[in-house]
From Swiss-Prot:
Belongs to the complex I subunit 4L family. Its EC number is 7.1.1.-. This is NADH-quinone oxidoreductase subunit K. It is a multi-pass membrane protein. The gene is nuoK.
Amino acid sequence: MISLSHFLVLGGVLFAIAVLGIFLNRKNVIVLLMAIELMLLAVNMNFIAFSHYLGDVHGQVFVFFILTVAAAESAIGLAILVLLFRNLRTINVDDLDQLKG
């Protein structure tokens, strides 16, 4: 049987991979967005695991709120990314330091 510690270790490993993805690759916006989504996935796994093992539904309801925020974040982030690529022809974070008003 899979215990709570297995789920928590898996969530911790996913979160650590996401943090490494952010720190090791600060150039590409798409990789940064994917790492943030992986962080949210790790947090959701921990909420689901605690909710299941405690017999409480509040953690599962909270996961639905996190999923809606993550979907909105992804949609807005990718829309901004498409506009930046159309205007600047790059998605490199270092090239996105120009302010135009």
